[in-house]
Design a protein with these regions (language model features):
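Beta->alpha turn/N-cap motifs
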Residues: 9-10, 30-32, 42-54, 59, ...
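Pocket-lining segment of extracytoplasmic ligand-binding domains
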Residues: 122-212
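Conserved C-terminal helix/tail region of periplasmic/extracytoplasmic solute-binding proteins
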Residues: 256-265
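Bilobed "Venus flytrap"/periplasmic-binding protein-like clamshell domains
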Residues: 1-20, 29, 75-136, 143-144, ...
Length: 265
């Protein structure tokens, strides 16, 4: 069994019980790459960006118990950096991190349906210099977003817009960024065993948030700030989180949100 993990601080509590020799093969991937691997059939389970799971749900099912990465009101690591508020980015160019899968779709959805801004989305790979000089905004996620938030000048940007805050203001529901999913074709016993193993590892990680934060303190922020960051996440998905996930899926369909490359055509 090959399991993909996301190498971000917000996912670290899931891995606390894995040790150096977990009972499965592991690979570390950014969210977008993990989604590609799931589609190609090269992984059996992973912490999958929820937008990718929407695409792959015929082949992957949520593990039991349902686990993921969700937040209410704010997240601090899915940030649109800009010099204007989002509603004033109409006709402007905004770069999107190469790592993102769910957050770039959330940004597109917010732009179309909430901010009412026609934004030109630019893949990060097209940037050649300082983003603050080339584009009007930059969407970052995960540890890169945390690092820029911890920087005194925020990379030269004047404004930071937390996409979880925008979603909460609009829909008053938690936002689920990623879910643990396992290939449906695996034997039922193997799927159940993995779900139990992961749940137990998370239980251990949840008891060690202070030490996890201390281990990562530095460029991402101080230990106290990072512990508060970790404690804000919901990792065991309940009815509100699942409702938020369904609402996101429905809104993506309603507004015909596609890959940002397609949206530029």
């Amino acid at each position: 069994m090959k399991v993909a993990k996301i190498p971000y601080l917000n996912a670290a509590p899931f891995y606390e019980g894995w040790g150096d020799d977990p009972p499965f093969e592991t690979v570390s991937m950014a969210p977008r790459d993990l989604g590609v691997a799931a589609g190609n059939g090269t992984i059996d389970a992973g912490l999958m960006a929820v937008a990718d799971w929407f695409r792959e749900d015929a082949s992957f099912e949520l593990i039991e118990p349902e686990l993921g990465v969700a937040a209410s009101e704010h997240v601090r690591s899915v940030i649109l950096f800009s010099n204007e508020n989002p509603g004033r980015l109409d006709g402007r160019r905004v770069a999107v991190t190469r790592e993102s899968s769910t957050s770039r779709r959330l940004a597109q959805l917010l732009a179309v349906a909430y901010w009412k801004a026609d934004i030109e989305w630019i893949p990060e790979d097209e940037l050649r210099g300082d983003p603050a000089e080339e584009v009007d905004g930059f969407l970052l996620i995960g540890d890169r977003a945390l690092e820029l938030m911890a920087d005194e000048v925020h990379g030269g940007w004047a404004r930071e817009t937390d996409l979880a805050t925008e979603w909460w203001s609009w829909q008053a529901l938690p936002f689920v960024f990623a879910v643990w999913a396992v290939r449906s074709g695996l034997p039922r016993r193997e799927r159940a065993r993995f779900g139990g193993y992961l749940s137990g590892s998370l239980a251990l990680g949840s008891e060690r948030l202070e030490s996890i934060a201390a281990e990562h303190a530095g460029t991402l922020g101080d230990a106290e700030t990072l512990e508060a960051y970790l404690r804000h996440f919901t990792y065991r998905l309940g009815p509100d989180e699942l409702a938020g996930m369904r609402r996101f899926r429905d809104l993506l369909a309603e507004h015909d949100i596609q890959e940002y490359q397609d949206a530029r055509a």
